[in-house]
Amino acid sequence: MENVRLTQYSHGAGCGCKISPQVLDTILRTQLAPFSDPNLLVGNESKDDAAVYDLGNGTAAISTTDFFMPIVDDPFDFGRIAATNAISDIYAMGGKPIMAIAILGWPVNVLAPEIAQQVIEGGRSVCREAGISLAGGHSIDAPEPIFGLAVTGIVDTDRVKRNNRAENGCKLYLTKPLGIGVLTTAEKQSKLADEHKGLARDWMCKLNIPGQDFANVEGVKAMTDVTGFGLMGHLSEICEGSQLKARVDFDSVPYLPGVFDYIAQGCVPGGTTRNFDSYGQKLGAMTEQQKALLCDPQTSGGLLIAVTPDAETEQQLQAIAARHNIELQAIGEMMPLDGDTLIEIC
């Protein structure tokens, strides 16, 4: 099979392909009266990670989909990353994935079908790691390669974790370092140092399985995954939904090695600017360096968790983190809303 650089066949990369929050708000406006279904526990009114439907037996179904264009050149790794990212929404709701189907767009007259087969194989390998079947899918002839999954999961109705239930005083935790967009941009610009090659890929392929365990902790009040809108975008959604503001300690935010050197070299993806243009007016003062990291679009990013500050909850949280080899420290806290600023950086 010929060597190809998949990223050269797409105009965007990973979750950086997302339509900006500002534009998306316009697209989703409707003149129609909302369809009322009492069993729909979570719809799109709160900008949550997935839809949740009450099955009436103490269990709810979770439904989500996610797909994008290549963020890496290797077809197998592209499939792995896209699948990991799609399954993450189930974990972010506190659920367990049970099945996935594939979504494939492929330029069949430009890229060989054997390359697409490797993309699917990468997705299949991650589904197996998550303990689910890749049970089917749909494909179209498309001008650019696109891959992702539609995923179904289940969760106890009293364990659903939403992004709009944070409480005043909650501590904020992030399970993966930031900088995915910066490092992948550095790689695309051939500026990535040898010691950093594969680092972003490995983090993007890390399943957010701990979300299932965090769902069992009563003190975990809100949870979401950090993807294309960056940490500030997804934290803004928590703040807006919970009618609170957040204070973030920048020095406590985890980040990938070398990220600030690459930012200084101009390795900032276009999605960072689009993100800031969409929600920058909600943020407090920050430096250009802080903006480049905190608004950096993540692909298959970590879980952002709002947790009550009591000792018992902290102990439970750290025990789960230890089981999953995660280092957790608080990066900020939720506070009463007292003006137009949703997030302060200190």
UniProtKB/Swiss-Prot annotation:
Q: Which residues form the active site?
A: 15
Q: Which residues bind Mg(2+)?
A: 49, 89, 225
Q: Does the keyword Kinase apply?
A: yes
- Cellular-component GO terms for this entry: cytoplasm
EC annotation? Answer: 2.7.9.3
Listed under catalytic activity are: hydrogenselenide + ATP + H2O = selenophosphate + AMP + phosphate + 2 H(+)
- Family under the similarity heading: Belongs to the selenophosphate synthase 1 family. Class I subfamily.
Q: What is this protein called?
A: Selenide, water dikinase
- Which species is the source of this protein? Photobacterium profundum (strain SS9)
What gene is it encoded by? selD
